[in-house]
Amino acid sequence: MEPKSTTPPPPPPPPVLGAPVPYPPAGAYPPPVGPYAHAPPLYAPPPPAAAAASAAATAASQQAAAAQLQNFWAEQYREIEHTTDFKNHNLPLARIKKIMKADEDVRMIAAEAPVVFARACEMFILELTHRGWAHAEENKRRTLQKSDIAAAIARTEVFDFLVDIVPRDEAKDAEAAAAVAAGIPHPAAGLPATDPMAYYYVQPQ
């Protein structure tokens, strides 16, 4: 007669609720290499939904900027049609006339020519400011900078003649992007600068 076994019977298997899936899913992240091959990842890549939401927000901001420009030009046309006072201007006519006379071929200038130039220059400055401000808002800044004007010029085909006058500082843009990635404040990236006088620096001529 054989002796009875004293080992308890194995417990029943747990109920199967679904297909077993490892967590995190296999292949979701590339396998780490180097001395920290067995360390868990600290940051997961952003989900595709976040990237799609960011792209949608960018497209919405661009559409809003385009709508603002359309409203701006419609308002300018209304102002021109209802203008009756041609004596008061935001830009000095004497300065404009002096610039016009810088051309040696110009001998005489009619009285209404500087008036038209003053209005055209004012509209040019306003449109360029609108486009630069749209770029500043895209970067979540409330201060219009030279880089915003340069970006507006680069984006607008009719402003191509200004590319050499206001070149875009690619090195500064790369420096700002690297600073943001490292979490370091940088004025060009819309973060508060460590130096409060950063915006008041004037490059020597």
UniProtKB/Swiss-Prot annotation:
Q: Which residues cross the membrane?
A: none
Is-annotated flag, keyword Repressor?
A: no
Q: Where is this region: Disordered?
A: 1-24
Localization (cell): Nucleus; Cytoplasm
Q: Which GO terms describe its molecular function?
A: DNA binding; DNA-binding transcription factor activity, RNA polymerase II-specific; protein heterodimerization activity
Q: Which Pfam families match?
A: Histone (PF00125)
User: Its Gene Ontology biological processes?
Assistant: regulation of transcription by RNA polymerase II
Q: Give a GO cellular-component term.
A: cytoplasm
* Database matches in InterPro entries: Histone-fold (IPR009072), Histone_H2A/H2B/H3 (IPR007125), Transcr_DNA_Rep_Reg (IPR050568)
- Keyword annotations of the record: Cytoplasm, DNA-binding, Nucleus, Transcription, Transcription regulation
Which family, according to UniProt? Answer: Belongs to the NFYC/HAP5 subunit family.
Complex and partners = Heterotrimeric transcription factor composed of three components, NF-YA, NF-YB and NF-YC. NF-YB and NF-YC must interact and dimerize for NF-YA association and DNA binding. Interacts with NFYB2. Interacts with NFYB8, NFYB10 and HD5/NFYB11.
Give the function comment from the record: Component of the NF-Y/HAP transcription factor complex.
What is this protein identified as? Nuclear transcription factor Y subunit C-6
Natural source organism: Oryza sativa subsp. japonica (Rice)
Name the gene: NFYC6
